[in-house]
């Protein structure tokens, strides 16, 4: 589904033109990542839809394209924007910024995915711009003699953007694609701003004199990049990017142009404001904060706010996605939820009854994780044997199921692929910390019991087998 505005958009995209970066990525997904033909075809269609809604990078004059992509939780949004970026580079976009969360871990995770699916090399081993091309995607691109895609950041935990390092090696790559994977951090975003405001010396691009300030820094910059568009992907756009302050109206009924937005929102908008041609695309599973941004909000220093003024695309749910409809057995007819659907063999949702002492009492405050508890709650499930880790049987079974699932994936050749299990049972960090310790202890117990000769080895194997046959 797509919602489009009536703004000044010019149709331009021809999917029948040569798209070598996309074609090598598509072959990589099919032959090396074992994506089904249907999944690759669906990705091709949705990314074509996105390309048709942005502007031609060679379009003359000033233009500003802003959109929002909405996808279900864990439904492949990162794969989608990597596919889209391959097509954008094929079309001629050269400078790409990916805003990837508020902390270094999230940034690193995104960089690893970009290394794998867009760059084709591990940026952790990059030194002074020299890349170590290894892996199937890199080989496919080397055969076609494609230009390398440069990275201003790397996949080390502290591999975020650094102005001095980028200036050192990127000034010789004036017309080749360059990707920045950065976290939403004040100092990092200001370093990116400074880098682009030094465009005449770094890039040799056409600039126009335009006074420009960076808040908190003295002096004016005088760069306005005219002939090279910027493409910004804002991952989890509802987290950190939205201005949560109140921009009031002045006596003319207009938004106060001197208003000071929240820091991250301000710096993102300033990056966009440096460029005459710009594309900004936000990705989220929860779009409500973004669609309620007022479409006329703007300031003198930041320009327009981040409202998706041109289009909103609702990504289709992949056929292999186990989302809330499957987990909670929800059936929809014409958008309406059918609540009394009969439980069938595909019903994923397991009603947990051992989390509290009195499961049917919503006010119960006793047991391992009752519905009502505070930050001082100590989760404890009582066993006859005091040596047992105090987590309930349902969580033990869930952990063992995850171990079996991971073993299956390893057996099928996905040893290097990430595997994770989320255990989120309390809104209180202190309580979650206790649960983390309990789960870690239980993992140690399982490892011990799986050792040959342990007196509970056979019993543990039998439990795994029982879960396998469920």
List the predicted regions and their residue ranges.
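Conserved P-loop NTPase catalytic core
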Residues: 125-139, 228-234, 243-409, 420, ...
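Walker A/P-loop
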Residues: 63-81
